[in-house]
């Protein structure tokens, strides 16, 4: 039984009691594995575009008249980026020396190459409050790239990108950035400082909105017996619902096309041409696919769903060829209803990069409960390694997900889809954590590009490795994509 205090706490967060009870039930039942048919590969599931096709889709994007908005998840702190340096600082404080060849030693040896170089005590300045405090800052506010007359943060590099592929005919560039509440002021101050500079440089007008993960998307933690985890003061412990919680933020944006890329996946401007080129290709592909979907739905309206066999076969072929949606045999009247339902969904085109490491999470062909197949992006934790078919599919994976998405989010009547209705709630995650030394179970919502977009028409397109340049550790800033040696 929940106490009155706990019920008030749930209501204050905007969490419906029914949602709360469903979350508790999820802990008890767990989340089922999806049925994997195969890894998506160039043979089936990933489009490899010819030079002519690439040129065509760039032209489609450049002539697109709709409203494009960049969406940048940027709420994570840079703690992991500096993990090795924190450990080294602790060892130095204990009287130990830096191990030769260690990440911290490489950091110190190359300190002059970093854009935030300062000749003072580097580790202290980089990590701790009353100095740079980089260890607890968001990645978006850390200087990544050094230029002749300026240094740039990832946030600024996204402003530059937006001007080069998301500027409309009026010169407007729209961008929504999700940030944590405690760091929003820092982003707003940086934006105010640099906005005019980049507007003049790129002849554009920025419209940047900062949003926060909504408290109603947080999920209660439970103890190891699946009872709500209670803190010492009697209140419940809620934890962030993961990046899937950002679906609510995405759903609030009024745009025709949303371009999604993580905050740390940027390059210095001299290498930006390929990134811009491929972003335009993905935008062109997504908007062309959407136009074809709209044409079929309007034709179905005109015919009042009394479709000739040839058109039914054509639509089935389109869904299978473009989105890997294979529809099983069924009576014709039921089939037309299924085809309409499958067509009338948001469209996303996702860049996929060739695997160079161990296979794991990435693009897969999934068999759904309704008997149809679809393309899905899975995390490694969603794959049942004990299932031979799933394990073999994972071993056969050729590409991974760099989080490079273009989403067309309006229907054929010009109305915004309610994206919250196109998810698979049974694709969440459960993990074990701790709070103040006590073990607990934490639950995450279906990932933003995973189960949160399960019921979308999805196409995967092979993109080059140069479009994927995340900064996971501070030493990644020494790679040629980020550093001028």
Residue map of PLM features:
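Domain-scale recognition of functional cores that engage charged ligands
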Residues: 7-8, 14-15, 32, 36-356, ...
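Long, compositionally biased intrinsically disordered regions
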Residues: 1-41, 334-344, 348-349, 356, ...
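Conserved catalytic alpha/beta cores of large enzymes that bind or transform nucleotide phosphates
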Residues: 129-135, 264, 269, 279-317, ...
């Amino acid at each position: 039984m929940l106490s009155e205090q706990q019920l008030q706490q749930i209501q204050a967060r905007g969490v419906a009691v029914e949602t709360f009870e469903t979350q508790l039930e999820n802990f008890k039942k767990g989340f089922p594995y999806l049925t994997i048919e195969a890894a998506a590969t160039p043979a089936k599931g990933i489009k490899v575009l010819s030079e002519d096709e690439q040129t065509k889709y760039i032209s489609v994007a450049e002539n697109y008249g709709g409203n494009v908005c960049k969406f940048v998840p940027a709420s994570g702190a840079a703690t992991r980026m500096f993990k090795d340096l924190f450990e080294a600082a602790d060892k130095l404080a204990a009287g130990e020396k830096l191990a030769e060849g260690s990440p911290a030693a490489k950091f110190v040896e190359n300190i002059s190459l970093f854009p935030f170089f300062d000749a003072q005590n580097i580790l202290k300045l980089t990590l701790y409050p009353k100095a740079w405090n980089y260890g607890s800052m968001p990645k978006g506010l850390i200087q990544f790239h050094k230029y002749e007359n300026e240094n740039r943060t990832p946030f600024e590099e996204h402003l530059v990108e937006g001007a080069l592929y998301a500027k409309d005919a009026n010169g407007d560039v729209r961008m929504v950035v999700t940030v944590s509440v405690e760091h929003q002021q820092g982003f707003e101050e940086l934006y105010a400082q640099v906005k005019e500079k980049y507007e003049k440089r790129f002849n554009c007008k920025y419209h940047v909105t900062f949003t926060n993960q909504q408290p109603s998307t947080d999920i209660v933690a439970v103890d190891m017996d699946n009872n709500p985890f209670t803190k010492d003061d009697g209140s419940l412990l809620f934890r962030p619902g993961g990046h899937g919680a950002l679906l609510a933020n995405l759903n609030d944006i009024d745009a025709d096309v949303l371009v999604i890329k993580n905050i740390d996946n940027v390059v210095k401007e001299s290498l930006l041409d390929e990134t811009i080129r491929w972003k335009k290709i993905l935008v062109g592909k997504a908007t062309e696919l959407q136009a074809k979907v709209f044409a079929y739905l309007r034709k179905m309206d005109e015919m009042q769903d009394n479709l000739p066999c040839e058109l039914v076969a054509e639509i089935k072929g389109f869904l299978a060829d473009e989105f890997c949606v294979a529809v099983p045999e069924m009576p014709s009247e039921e089939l037309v209803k299924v085809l309409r339902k499958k067509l009338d969904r948001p469209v996303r085109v996702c860049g996929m990069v060739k695997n160079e490491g161990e296979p794991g999470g990435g693009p897969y062909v999934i068999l759904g409960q309704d008997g149809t197949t679809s393309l899905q992006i899975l995390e490694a934790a969603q794959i049942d390694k004990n299932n031979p078919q799933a394990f073999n599919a994972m071993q056969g994976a050729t590409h991974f997900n760099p989080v490079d998405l273009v989403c067309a989010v309006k229907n054929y009547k010009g109305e915004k889809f309610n994206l919250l209705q196109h998810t698979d709630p049974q694709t969440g995650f459960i993990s074990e954590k701790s709070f103040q030394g006590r073990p607990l179970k934490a639950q995450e919502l279906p990932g933003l590009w995973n189960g949160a977009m399960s019921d979308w028409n999805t196409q995967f397109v092979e993109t080059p490795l140069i479009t994927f340049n995340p900064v996971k550790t501070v030493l990644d800033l020494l790679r040629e994509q980020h550093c001028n040696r």
